[in-house]
Structure formats: C-alpha cells, structure tokens
Amino acid sequence: LVGYYGYAMIAVSEPILKIQESETNDFDLMLFDKIIAYDHLREKMTVIVNMKTYDPERQYEQAVNDINEIINTITDPAPLAKLESDKNVEFTSTYTEEEFCDMVNKTKEYIFDGDIFQCVVSRRFETEYKGSLLNAYRVLRITNPSPYMVYMNIEGDEIISTSPETLVKLQNGVLNTFPIAGSRPRGADKQEDDALADELIKDEKELAEHNMLVDLGRNDIGKISKFNSVKVTSYQQILRYSKIMHICSEVEGELKDGLDAFDAVESLLPAGTLSGAPKIRACQIIDELEKTPRGVYGGALGYVDFNGNLDTCIAIRMAVKKGNKVYVQALSLIHI
C-alpha cells in the first residue's frame, strides 16, 4: 500500500480533537499489482507483478506475460513527453504579515499561560497552475535531493515532496522514529560547514527544542512498544543534507504483540516537529488559530508492505496540486 495519511488523521486516535475538514481525503492508500522498483544505490531495477491465488497456473502465466511486457516497455521507451508548465507563477498567502504575527503572538500567550511548551503554526500559500508538478519534481531531484523523494498522482491530484524526516519505520517488529530539530545552512566550504555545525550543537535553544521532541518521540513509540524496549539509540547527531544540516536522534522500540503498521502511524501522527508539545493541546491550538486545514501537509507519506513493514516520512517541504490550484505550506516553531 502506497499513499498518504493526512494531518487530520490524529482525530481518529484522539476523538477529542475536532480538526478542520480538508479539501483532500484524510488518507489515501493505493494497492498496485504491477511495480517497478529501482535501487539507486546498486543501480538495479526489479519488476514485480502480484498474482491472484485462484487458478494459479493461468495467473502465473499471465504474471510472466505482464513482466515481459513491462520489461519490453522499459527497454524500448517512448520519447519523454513535454509537460505543460506555467512560467510566471506568483503565490499568495492566506495571511497578511500582520495576521501571521498576531497568530504567533497568540501562540506565545498559550506558552506563557502554561498550556504548551512549544507549538508549530503554519500558513498556506497558493497559486493557479495548469501544468504538472512532475516538472518541479524533476528539478527538485537534482537541486534538493533528500532521503524521501515523493511524486504521487492520485486521480489527477498531485503531491511532490523532498522530505528529510522519517515519521516512523517498522521493520521485522522493530520501530524507529528520528526526531529532528535545530538547523543551520550548509557552509560554503568544510571549514565554514564545521563551524556552523559546532554553533548548532552548542545552541541552548536548539538543544532544548530537540530534547523536547526526543521525549515526545519516546512517548509516542512507548505507547505501542513492549515494556522496557524503548531506547534512544542515537542522540544529538549532526545530519547534513544538500542545503541544510539538522540535529537528529533515533528512538527505537519493539512493537507490542497484536499491533501492526497502522497502529504505528496512528501513534506517531502528527510528528512533534509539525505540532508541538504536549501534542494534543498543541493540535487544539493549531486548529483554533490556523485559517485553513492542513490536508496532507503535516501528515505522512509512505508505504506498508505485505510483510507488515512500514516506512513513512513526514509530509513536509511539499506541494499539493488539486484541480488548477497548487498549495505549499510554511511553518514556524514557537518555543520560549
């Protein structure tokens, strides 16, 4: 199953929350019977066809024919079609600068009043666009490579993302989440890069934010893990990407018997880096203050396989196209 879980999915596990209804589905998962998997590291392509179990001889023969047809298509590709694109695109914000600052100040008041420790508020930018986001995705693969490069086309609606952040992984019963908080740009050379990394790892504010998210990750993983299995396996490491560096930790746990990948997503969603702490109260404040529903943004993108394994990233650094409108979202983490 491949697809997304929207930000509003938290209302499933926490019915006390009344999240704004979005123009996109709360979740959308797709089952594919034909898959082309490409291993970029080993430069190896695998063609997979899932066959039905009734009439196995005939189904097997059909699956082999399908594989050969796919291989023939790959080895004799058609010229890449030129995709329609708008050259002059201007985004408009759903907030004026004054309105956004007012939202930030209200968030600060909640922190001073003791409701929350930190909160992540965001605003949406949108534009009219008739082209395909596949063009933008092609460019981003080169200019901003990330651990999770995503392009989805779901019945005409498009999603692209260059997310660096894992929400939750599940592999052979072992859960992992990777809290990320604190950032600096990459340096122009090694000396500047090392200096920025040293500055980041010594920044008390960045470390306080990061520690809060590590605690939140331990709590979220702990809800679905076996007793005494939760541990921090990596702590406050500098992780470098093409244009930015972050402080990253890793939290691990063993999934409780009787639970599965969907329980893992439910427990971790939304990530603390997209909501705040305590998470439930932060989500209530976000819903109160933000004008527009987040939709896919702040949720998760990824897959669940037939062995019950899971890999999802946080739906961030992304764009969504629905109809002729494209939406992007920018956030601000408020911590005092």
Which functions belong to the PLM regions below?
Residues 1-334:
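Extended alpha-helical targeting/anchoring segments
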